[in-house]
Amino acid sequence: SEERIENTVLRVLNVEAGARLKVYVETCVHCGLCSEGCHYYLSHDKDPRLSPAGKVKQTLWEMIRNKGRVSKAFMRQAAVIAATQCNLCKRCAMYCPFGIDVAYLMSVVRRITHLLGLTPQYIQATAHSHSVCMNQMWVKEDEWPDTLQWQEEEARSEIPNLRIPLEKEGADVM
């Protein structure tokens, strides 16, 4: 319901997110310098809607401006933007003259959409896999050695001397 949406948005914005969110929202001057750091924006013909500021403007700023009073259709679209158009890499923060962490802002959108049950199913499944197995492939701890040995054998067709060190003290790990 729209009441549930409003309550959820306001709880996350006012209770969970706090001062950091407020500082970022009040500091951003919408200059667009963050855009040059966003690979998604750059790879989509520099569409302004896909710039970091554009994504936040279409999602979080609307929620703030409307004090949480947004439609379910709006929230569905916000979930798509937050889950598929930003991978939270934080490159935009490196380009922002004020150091605004747009990834944090988009993670707030993800949190809200998650609480409303709007996170895309494949992302929910991946998150569940991580919480259960600590990886996205449902590989259980006792299956890791066999899995890594299999990957090592497969990769040797391209890199003949490849070795994945298991239980080797001081091994370089990527």
Which residues does each predicted region cover?
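N-terminal cysteine/histidine-rich coordination modules
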Residues: 2-30, 35-75
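Iron-sulfur-cluster electron-transfer modules
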Residues: 16-18, 22-25, 57-174
